[in-house]
Amino acid sequence: MEPILLRASEESKNQRLDAFLASSLDGLTRSQATRLIESGEVAVNGRAVSKSYKLAGGEDVAVTLPEPEPVEAVPQDIPLDVVYEDADVIVVNKPSGMVVHPAPGHPDGTLVNALLYHCVGTLSGIGGALRPGIVHRIDRDTSGLIIAAKNDAAHQYLSAQLADHTLARTYECIVVGKLREDRGTVDAPIARHPTDRKRMAVVAGGREAVTHWEVIARYPGYTHVRCRLETGRTHQIRVHMAYIGHPILGDTVYGAKKEVPGLTGQCLHAVGLRFLHPRTHEVVELSCPLPDEFTRMLQKIRK
């Protein structure tokens, strides 16, 4: 494979090379980064270095990745929290930490693996072999409602609603700091970060991205917020809240790098979903409670 070229930013100064690679390349763990360095597949400014090499900032880093192993989505008996199900759609409350579909680095244990087992071959094929039935996605460390289609007609009908912004998705989150206004809208385009492939960013010329938010409650140093997506870009709420100076609590990518004790992901939960049913054309409105980690964190910041 052709080497991937990365530029170490000034923010990467004093960061170990293996940690830099793990944070810059999708699906790459720190141990995998270490093996690449030790096998000579990584060069900094054209020369091989050790895994403990600390970046000065500004270096050119070339990484040659091995050919990815083929990934196949197979049914797995993984428990699902099914919120709604009929012959056309299934809506699941996904736990934080679960990846939506298989990919290199996450070949199994995903929501798709669980859906294949639960639905026994009745998922739409429009999303392809690795994403059967998947109409939209939510991040691995985000919990909450996600809808999947059981046939192609349902998939097309739901995808059309997603495209014209009539499939409504509501989230709740805890953000760092106190939002001054009671409500607002972030209208800022999002694209891949220019130097960090694992991150998205507000970038001029990026894809349109609109998030509407309103304050639920304010606490010392934090705000409980409800967000409604008008568009659905990758990491949209996380990027937009960080962009206005209020990153989501527990988000180590767009907020503080230090993990929050008692929190395994970020405090972001897809709490509500509203759509027109693909067969009856009636409105279906669903909600699910906040996960235990989220409610415990609310109790903690109230004190």
Kindly label every feature range from the protein language model.
Residues 213:
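Long C-terminal interaction/binding lobes of large macromolecular proteins
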Residues 90, 225-228:
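Short, well-ordered beta-strand segments enriched in hydrophobic/aromatic residues
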